[in-house]
A protein has these predicted regions:
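N-terminal helix-turn-helix DNA-binding module of bacterial transcription factors
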Residues: 1-41
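Hinge/cleft segment of the Venus flytrap/periplasmic-binding protein
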Residues: 27, 31, 188-189, 205, ...
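N-terminal helix-turn-helix/winged-helix DNA-binding helices
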Residues: 29-61
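Hinge/beta->alpha junction and helix N-cap segments in small-molecule ligand-binding domains
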Residues: 55-64, 85-96, 152-158, 180-200, ...
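Signal peptide-proximal N-terminal region
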Residues: 71-82
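Hydrophobic alpha-helical
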Residues: 110-129, 215-271
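Flexible loop/hinge segments that line or gate small-molecule binding clefts
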Residues: 120-157, 270-278
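Hydrophobic alpha-helical segments within soluble ligand-binding/sensing domains
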Residues: 150-176, 225-226, 289-306
Length: 335
């Protein structure tokens, strides 16, 4: 059998007898032959364009971390023909819809997307899926949208973990305050991550009957009106759970008012959060590794599109617990 015949069978082109196809496929199966994707892409000078659709990171420290991870992946995979275009929206739904319409009109091989506004994100993804290209979500998972990959934290389990951290060492009845701090344009009733974290938090106490009695109070505070916090809210409170990265707002109030003996659990390694963690005001921060999410999101598209590999559509990041004694070591470990 000639080399040309084998080449036509492997690349599925030209006319070849069924007998020769069976012979070549048997040898491929026996020896585990794999097509050299790199060589093929180089030979045809193939390019892969990915779109990244994220909130603007100016004034939003959290969103710089996934961008750092994306940039690292972009540099690493650029020699294999991968290029990335960025699309940013301001932190309001009008800006989001405007940029979403722009992204929908353009053609890419893959999309990395962080859903922030629930209804708008569902509508955008439902429309974008019609393009039939790979999509990866980071930070938040919209379970209503099927066949879309997600790389990020299991929000329900992270809330469950927060409940466990708050309950440690408590021997008698305790009072817990859940402070829900949002921007004016956010709605906790429609924010999937928020809901899942709070649901997981309550589930821990419900499922563990051996715990002492805990009493729960919820308050809603707008980020733009930080003076809504009052000392009265914290009377008799033993612990505070803030289900997002704005835990530093509560920590600042507690420190300035010299409120003692209140355990605080929140999320994310923002500088202000780390400062209060180091001061001993915040007890625990749950880290969702946003830089790794960004890197792994692009890596997912690279493996699926460039390497033609089968990849998992659901990858949960480990739940890392940061305390005063270990956060500096965590900061030293980079991608």
């Amino acid at each position: 059998m000639s080399v040309g015949t084998v080449d036509r069978i492997i690349h599925n082109r030209g006319q070849v007898t069924e007998e020769n196809i069976e012979k070549v496929n048997a040898i491929i199966k026996e020896y585990g032959y794999k097509k050299n994707i790199f060589a093929s892409n180089l030979a045809f000078n193939k390019k892969f364009k990915f779109a990244v659709f994220l909130p603007q990171n100016q004034g939003l420290e959290y969103w710089q971390a996934p961008l750092d991870g994306i940039a690292k992946a972009a540099e690493e995979f650029s020699r294999f023909g991968v290029t990335i275009d960025y699309f940013f929206y301001e932190y309001d739904n009008v800006s989001f819809r405007k940029m979403a319409n722009k992204v929908l009109k353009l053609d890419y091989d893959g999309l990395l997307f962080a859903p922030i506004f629930y209804e708008e994100s569902v509508a955008f993804l439902s429309e974008y899926k019609k393009k039939n290209i790979p999509i990866v979500m980071i930070d938040s998972n919209l379970q209503e949208i099927e066949e879309v990959a997600y790389i990020g934290q299991d929000s329900y389990q992270s809330g469950y973990l927060a409940g466990k951290l708050i309950s440690y060492g408590v021997k008698s009845e305790g009072n817990i305050l859940i402070v829900k701090i949002t921007r004016d344009i956010e709605s906790t009733s429609k924010t999937t991550v928020y809901l899942q974290r709070i649901q997981g938090f309550y589930a821990y106490f419900k499922e563990n009957a051996f715990l002492p009695k805990f009493n729960f109070t919820e308050v809603n505070v707008k980020d733009a009106a930080k003076n809504q916090l009052t000392s009265k809210m914290f009377l008799g409170i033993d612990a505070v759970f803030v289900p997002n990265s704005r835990v530093h707002i509560v920590a600042k109030f507690i420190k300035e008012n010299n409120l003692q003996g209140i355990r605080i659990v929140g999320y994310d390694l923002l500088k202000q959060n780390l400062d209060y963690l180091n001061d001993g005001v915040i007890d625990f921060l749950i880290h969702q590794k946003p830089e790794e999410q960004g890197y792994m999101g692009i890596s997912h598209l690279y493996k699926k599109l460039v390497l033609k590999e089968d990849v998992k559509n659901m990858i949960y990041m480990p739940l890392e617990i940061l305390v005063k004694e270990n956060y500096s070591y965590s900061q030293q470990i980079k991608l």
